[in-house]
């Protein structure tokens, strides 16, 4: 019995020594480290330019119109930052009246070579806009739809607002601009 206890004691002691040796070996061959990574995003800046057909700035106070008029208005967007980006614009119709609608009162001649109108209501520039570049015109004229604008619109102010969004193209691969990641919610 004494010999059996001695054998068990020897086996337990051997197991403890093997465990301690293995842990020491693992500690000797492994290490734990800490790294801090700093990620900085670039700033995206753009400018919307509106011109008349003769190249002068579109008047801030707007123009007087009558139904059926075609107004010369050229809208361009400039990349005014140091990063290339994808670009989209949205046209927002407005009127200073609660009773009348501004829906479908404007008809634009979209530049379909450089821009694509998508079902989400945004018009996407078909390529990456590099720093310092300016887009081709989104459109060059606006028609006031005569069938929609009647005498009830006399004295009212109609507005066509151009809103633009951009997301960086660096590290944001996409086959088409509308597939890029990071567009703000509409």
Where are the regions a protein language model picked out?
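Short, Lys/Arg-rich N-terminal segment immediately upstream of the first membrane anchor
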Residues: 1-5
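Surface-exposed, hydrophilic segments of mature proteins
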Residues: 18-22, 28-186
């Amino acid at each position: 019995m004494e010999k059996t206890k001695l054998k068990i004691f020897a086996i337990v002691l051997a197991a403890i020594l093997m465990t301690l040796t293995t842990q020491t070996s693992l500690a000797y061959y492994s290490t734990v480290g800490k790294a801090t990574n700093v990620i900085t995003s670039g700033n995206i800046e753009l400018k919307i330019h509106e011109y008349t057909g003769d190249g002068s700035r579109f008047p801030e106070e707007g123009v007087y119109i009558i139904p059926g008029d075609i107004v010369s208005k050229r809208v361009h967007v400039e990349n005014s930052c140091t990063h290339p980006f994808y670009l989209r614009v949205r046209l927002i119709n407005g009127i200073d009246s609660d009773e009348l609608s501004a829906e479908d009162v404007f008809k634009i001649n979209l530049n379909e070579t450089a821009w694509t109108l998508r079902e989400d209501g945004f018009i996407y520039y078909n390529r990456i806009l590099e720093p310092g570049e300016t887009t081709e015109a989104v459109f060059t004229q606006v028609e006031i739809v005569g069938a929609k604008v009647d005498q009830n619109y006399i004295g009212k102010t109609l507005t066509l607002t151009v809103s633009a969004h951009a997301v960086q193209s660096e590290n944001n691969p996409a086959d088409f601009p509308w597939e890029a990641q990071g567009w703000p919610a509409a």
